[in-house]
Amino acid sequence: MTTITPDEMKSLETLFMSETGTPSILLMEHAAQGVAAAISRHAPKSARVLFLCGPGSNGGDGYAAARLWCLGGGQADVWEVTSAVRGDALTNRTLALLYGVRVLPSVDAVDVAEYAAVVDALYGTGLNHAIEGDAAILIHRLNDHPQIPVIAVDIPSGLDGTTGRALGADVVRAAETVTFHRIKQGLLLRQGVEYTGEITVQPILIRPGDDIDLGFGGLEMLSPAALAPLFARTPALHKGDCGRAVIFCGSRGMVGAAAFCANACIRAGAGLTTLLCRESLLPMLQVLAPGATCVPLPETNGLLTPQAARITRETLDKADAACIGCGCGLTPDVTMLLRVFAEADCPIVWDADALTLLATHDGILPLKEEDIITPHPGEAARLLEQHVEFILDEPLDALSRLHDLCGCCVLLKGARTLVSDGDATYISLYGTPALAKGGSGDVLSGILTALLCQRNRLSTSLSTSALAACGVLIHALAGLRAEKRFGANCSTPQALIDTIRLDDKEL
């Protein structure tokens, strides 16, 4: 499944209606059916529901949905921006009144608390300015009643459908957004994450492949159902078939980062996991990550010796994939190993402290095409020498710049994590605040390393970005399982590891 922009959707609808002779009001009817179905998920069939209808086709969807709600046994009140609507919206307004929909005379007549649910059909994806006047007053009033579910039609009013940016101070906060044909890109970016609630895609007659034929790309989204067949194991499989992973993570005070990464790597299917560790950390890591073999790196006065570089190089020569960075520290001896990892033949996952060092040391970038960097917004800002606000405000631009700088697959962490190799771009539909805790990123790096080292077993045709997107999905689903068991506040990195699955079961 891929996203679509509002401009692309408009072109697609126009072409579809022209080629098939389908009237636009028929598309509107299918859209309204999806909205009416969504209302029934939040309110009883006989409930009284408020419909906020704007002057355009979004309002027309609202009038049609109000009629369908009345036909199903419910009660519908409409507040409208204006009664002077045209075209399909006028037709559906007329029909709505015939079927018992009541139009409220003014904004003062609207008491949001009287309704079981509210439908936001004020403004759609064509909006390009802040909402003002009575509509803004109503949106503010709606958002003051969070206990009343709001169903947004195609997109919450006040949100940019392409960028996800809030167009003003007043944006509808929806419990569910019913979007049509494909998810609009803006629902998944910036403030879109905050305002859209659950996203439901309603078909409106246009065939799923029609936009692909037009060359519309969009952000790609993976379904949990795609994981199980990809990671299925044959009965004769042995550990050598599942790859050898090498991890250099952890330092004094950050031993847990190495353990989380290694244990997640083992859990996610790596056949053999080896921890390169400072010799002073060896006793602790052998207890914290008993499933991993440990290769001690010699130290003098707390710093790795030049011999550590030789041992690291020899160990990486046997690896199918490797990871560096989680809690490894920022000391000069780590920079020495950074260069050894950059010269390795196997794909590398670069995370945390390794990214900070990449940002401050010349001569290492660009990396190999099959490598993966995993910055959060702060690390991305350091790499690009930008403010964090730029990363948050322009995530797709930041993603592109990071790829140009590093020459490899980029995994930009966030509420909607993005992955790109310069061609395909993936976005995660799944996530939970349970992941907002130190150590979650270490678990993700372990998962990614495990997938990379199993690449030959899985599919040599699978791109690095697709593999990384699978890792993000596995990590997110583990977060949802951990949240289900322990709650968003009480989940831990270890709980994530314990709930890692390479399929979509037990959600």
What is each residue range found by the language model?
Residues 1-80, 176, 187-349, 356-372, ...:
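Small-residue (G/A/S/T)-rich helix-start motifs and N-terminal tracts that mark the onset
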Residues 36-122, 130-153, 337, 363:
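Nucleotide and nucleotide-moiety/phosphate-recognizing core
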Residues 82-85, 156-157, 280, 354:
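Short beta-alpha junction loops
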Residues 116-117, 122-217:
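Internal gly/pro-rich beta-alpha loop/helix module
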